[in-house]
Amino acid sequence: MMFQSFFTAHPRLGQRLCLIFSLLSTAAFAQSPYFEITQKPAQVAVTTAHPMATEAALKMLQQGGSAIDAAIAAQLMLGLVESQSSGLGGGTFLMHWDAAQKSLTSLDGLAISPQKTTASLTTDVDGSQLPSASMGRGGRSAGVPGTLPLLAKAHAKFGKLSWPTLFVPAIEAASKGFPMPAYMHQILSAPTAAKDHADMLALYFDDAQKVKPVGTLIVNPDYAKTLQSIALKGPSAIWADGASTDFLAAVQRGYKPSLMTEEDLKSYPVEEREPLCGPYLRYRVCVMAPPSFGGVVVLQVLQMLAEKSNLGTDFNQPEFAHAFAEAGKLAQVDRRLYVADPAFFKVPAKALVSPAYVKQRAALIQTNTLPSYGPGLPEAMLAESSGQTLAQATAASSADATSQLAVVDAQGNAVSMTTTNNLNFGSRILVQGYVLNNAMTNFTTSPKPGEIAPNKMEPRKRPVTSMVPTMVFDEAGQLVTLGGSAGGGQIVDYVSANLVRMLANQLSPFEALAQGHISTALPNRVQLEKGTSAAQLAEALLAKGQKVEVVPMNSGMGFLKRAGNGWIGSADPRRDGVAWGFNPKP
């Protein structure tokens, strides 16, 4: 009954399933060793946001490639078939588990601000103020992309196959064409889509400026050419032979052009970061550290819920759903004040997720909601905050953007990767076959006089983000779960809730990802997913003083979970993704 109501609430899912089943029924797939892993475990496992990306990853693994090789091949394909969400013009977080070395690391490839950045996105170079409504898209909204440098660094550290091999599936698909995906079609079908996506008219729209129907073959020769150059000449080729000039010309068109320079493009720094880890029940949950605020929120929420163990872990019970919402509010208040790029602000990340501090915050959760919560004061900030007024970061967008993938290879190495253009189709600039991000919108607007804004715009800085690739380990140090989600600011709620469902309630990823969503990503409200069991909580939560909205929530989750000697997994049924795997021959 639960799944029936879910599918009734998501009628477009039928279109997506038809496309997936058509891929599954092809002779090539029928003869392949791949199979769907929602219930049947596989030793090698992949979940991505599109079947062609999952298949590209599996091809690398079948050739003896590493989890990193598979993730790179999947990302290159996602830049084609899910170009609204991620690609070479975006930013990426990657978490990697080396099974032999028992070593966990993460790479930060977020888009960064150019060197010539102004004080804020709405501040022009002469100091005059610009209309915020006009600055969310276009050249000035774009950050220096970091996805390709991250992929190159990951391959240098953990890759096994040759660099050109990883590009073969995406080049072939870009050259020969791919079927218009249902989810991309849905996004392009917004009432103003043709006007808003003028750079993409020839690619995705017909002569009447209508979105090409689902299943229509889409060919992207510019993307194929870009990939061929990078595959043969290496990552630096993306800016060689006049490509950087073409790129800069594209972002300097239109209202308030980008301030990016060629030096910005060619000197992008990938950061290797220590993951942030904390306890939940008998597990150790490891997440992306700042500038991800997602990691801080997820660890705080999980620990606060553990402190409220008397309420159980059933999201269909109003008492627990209320506690989840209140924990989310508390965590959001803290992150808006204290999380920023650690190169520019001393972020008290470990103090914010320490059990003692989180226990204090959990004690604030009452039977009924409070009108508002103030931020806490972790011990690490006592001296730092003296005499200072910190400006809170703005709330993150609730747009259903971004993409998530997870991979486990034959050696047990694993990748969880969240990758984004920020909002769908980012800046709405298409250059060399890929979409450019609009990550500059993630910085805080201009602070008031006397305030310090940790997330303010500064040269060569990373804005905060909700993205939170995650890995979970048991008491023996064995990796048991990995994944993450798309979905804008609501990512933190999607990930937190599904970790509760998989770890506390022992649901499979397939069961967990089909549950209805609850979110407090936007201030002073609780959002419940329309058409799901979560929406039925509205009356009970209203009685507890919550301001409730029942809305569609297209997440974009992807998780893998250990099952015996293999892995089961799922991609979010709200989008086009699939989770497949295979068992290597002895």
Language model features: what each stretch is:
Residues 31-55, 59, 67-240, 245-289, ...:
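Noncatalytic scaffold domains of N-terminal-nucleophile
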Residues 286-295, 402, 406, 416-428, ...:
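Glycine-rich phosphate/pyrophosphate-binding beta-alpha loops
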Residues 411, 460-462, 495, 504-552:
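Extended C-terminal subregions enriched in glycine
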Residues 1-12:
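N-terminal secretory signal peptides that target proteins for export/translocation
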Residues 272, 399-402, 465-467:
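Short, small/polar residue-rich loop motifs at catalytic or cofactor-binding pockets
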Residues 14-27:
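Bacterial N-terminal signal peptides
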Residues 308-420:
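Internal maturation/activation junctions in enzymes
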Residues 80-87, 91-97, 101-106, 258-261, ...:
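Active-site rim segments in enzyme catalytic domains, especially the processed small/beta chain
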